[in-house]
Amino acid sequence: GGHPLEDLVLVGVAGLVVLAVRRALRPDVRLPSAAAPQRPVMIWNAKSGGGKAVTHDLPAQARRRGIEPVELTEGTDLRALLEQLVDEGADGLAAAGGDGTQAVVAAVAAEHDLPFACIPAGTRNHFALDLGVDRDDVVGALDAFVDGGERVVDLAEVNGTVFVNNCSLGLYAEAVQRDEYRGAKLRTILATATEAFGPSDAVTLDYRWTGPDGSIEQGATVILVSNDVYRLGGGVGAGTRPRLDAGVLGVAVLRSPDTASTGAPVPLWSAWSVTEFEVDADEPAHDGSVHVGVDGEAMTMTSPLRFTTRPGAL
């Protein structure tokens, strides 16, 4: 092997290259100036991200900037709370919590044509990453309502429920219904699928959808529908979206090897973009209900699932 010092230098150079590429991939958008809201509020969750809002003293930091902090407590109807705040005169809505919270606050902001600020106080903060918000500067994100610029981005929805990142069906959606897998990454769940759920055919549910060529397809382990298109694969930048204003849904379908090996050749993984997408699903319960993971939150919806994009809604 090489000299330890040479190895250290190579590792250091490799790390700098990766960092440089990541910075190059980070959205760098020069934003037009926007008038600051006069009565902004910040919804914050003390438990999100291991307590980031508390660690960074976000309520006090918000008050210093003229932003009213409103704590989201367990059992609170977030949408009803937001509607009440808007009725009372709130003219800007910020969300300091996970992506599920971001989606609800963003939806209400869009409905009332109010400015929205994403505060990266969740665990992964995927929406913040793709917006170009510095996830390491939690407090600095509050300045969006002080001297920030305006950026218009898309939202997406499934059966009337808004999402900012993605909606998952199949194995991942089944997993997030379970406490032990909540918050786990998709690749972790896939790696332990057989152990957790049994044979692969037990998690290949009867989904039917229209493929990119217009044909009806069925049989999938995972269907992922996203607000705009993710970079896929294992390279640097994978799992991020270069644009949030393309006005499309990204669709990615993963099949089990058993499904793909029967009949005509079928790729294990396929991806494309559309503006509308529909999935018919027969769950084992046969009651028309479908387990869905919406921005990481476990939900149950009624089939068929109708996905649409809302270009420039936020």
Language model segments and positions:
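Alpha-helical membrane-targeting segments
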Residues: 182-201, 235-237, 250-271
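Catalytic core of DAGKc-family lipid kinases
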Residues: 34, 41-43, 47, 52-56, ...
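ATP/NTP phosphate-donor binding region
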Residues: 1-93, 103
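Active-site beta-loop-alpha substructure in enzyme catalytic cores
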Residues: 220-255
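N-terminal glycine-rich "phosphate-gripper" loop used for MgATP/nucleotide binding
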Residues: 95-99
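Short glycine/serine/threonine-rich phosphate/pyrophosphate-binding segments
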Residues: 100-105, 126-127
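ATP/nucleoside-binding phosphotransfer catalytic cores, i.e., glycine-rich phosphate-binding loops
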Residues: 1-22, 212, 243-246, 253-314
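Short acidic/glycine-rich loop or secondary-structure boundary segments that cap or lie
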Residues: 172-175, 216-219, 231-235, 259-262
